[in-house]
């Protein structure tokens, strides 16, 4: 195991987070200043729960986090986090109603990743599909001037995601956190200044 993997794994364990991904979110927020007290956040692909915990800390008791994943979350969650076990491609009517009731959200974030095959083209294609679905949800439930975070496995069609995001955000920036593994193909795109009433 490489030293940097040891560091973030042990740091997460020591600070009682379920995964090292918490530090990716912290780095993203340090760079872009996305969260404030009292905000509402939607966390897509939330399991095992690190991003929901991180967002809950940032928005405080007056804020709220709605999180969902096809897999369950087993860790205790604070009172300002509501978790729903949902497939975002086949959302139940009850969950859609919750999104309508709780939204629009100040921040929508997706750390979703597909089941990897080891075939880069396949993994990239599946990752892009998740990203575009997350963006479709953001277009429905993100607040005017809100922010969007999405992870993708890099590949030839990443530009498709970027082009789509640029139609709906004033600024779109790529970011690779230091806490990402050096050889990882993952990169995050951050959309700032959502233009809610843009048509495409």
From Swiss-Prot:
It catalyses: uridine(2552) in 23S rRNA + S-adenosyl-L-methionine = 2'-O-methyluridine(2552) in 23S rRNA + S-adenosyl-L-homocysteine + H(+). Keywords: Cytoplasm, Methyltransferase, rRNA processing, S-adenosyl-L-methionine, Transferase. S-adenosyl-L-methionine binds at residues 49, 51, 69, 87, 111. InterPro entries: RNA_methyltr_RlmE, RNA_MeTrfase_FtsJ_dom, rRNA-MeTfrase_E, SAM-dependent_MTases_sf. It is an enzyme of class 2 (transferase). CDD domains: AdoMet_MTases. GO terms for cellular component: cytoplasm. PANTHER family: RIBOSOMAL RNA METHYLTRANSFERASE, RRNA METHYLTRANSFERASE 2, MITOCHONDRIAL. Belongs to the class I-like SAM-binding methyltransferase superfamily. RNA methyltransferase RlmE family. This is Ribosomal RNA large subunit methyltransferase E. It comes from Lawsonia intracellularis (strain PHE/MN1-00).
């Amino acid at each position: 195991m490489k030293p940097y993997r040891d560091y973030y794994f042990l740091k997460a364990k020591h600070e009682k987070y379920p995964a090292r991904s918490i530090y990716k979110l912290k780095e993203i927020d340090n760079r872009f200043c996305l969260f404030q007290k009292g905000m509402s956040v939607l966390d897509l692909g939330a399991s095992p729960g690190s991003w929901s915990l991180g967002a809950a800390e940032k928005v405080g008791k007056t804020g709220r986090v709605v999180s969902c994943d096809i897999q369950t979350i087993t860790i205790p969650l604070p009172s300002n986090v509501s978790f729903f076990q949902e497939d975002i491609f086949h959302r139940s009517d009850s969950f859609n109603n919750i999104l309508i009731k709780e939204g629009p959200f100040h921040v929508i974030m997706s750390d979703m990743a597909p089941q990897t095959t080891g075939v880069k083209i396949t993994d990239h294609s599946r990752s892009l599909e998740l990203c575009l679905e997350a963006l479709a949800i953001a277009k429905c439930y993100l607040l005017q001037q809100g922010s969007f975070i999405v992870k993708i496995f890099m590949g030839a069609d990443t530009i498709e995601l970027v082009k789509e995001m640029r139609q709906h955000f004033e600024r779109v920036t790529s970011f690779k956190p230091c806490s990402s593994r050096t050889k990882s193909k993952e990169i995050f795109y951050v959309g700032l200044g959502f233009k809610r009433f843009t048509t495409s």
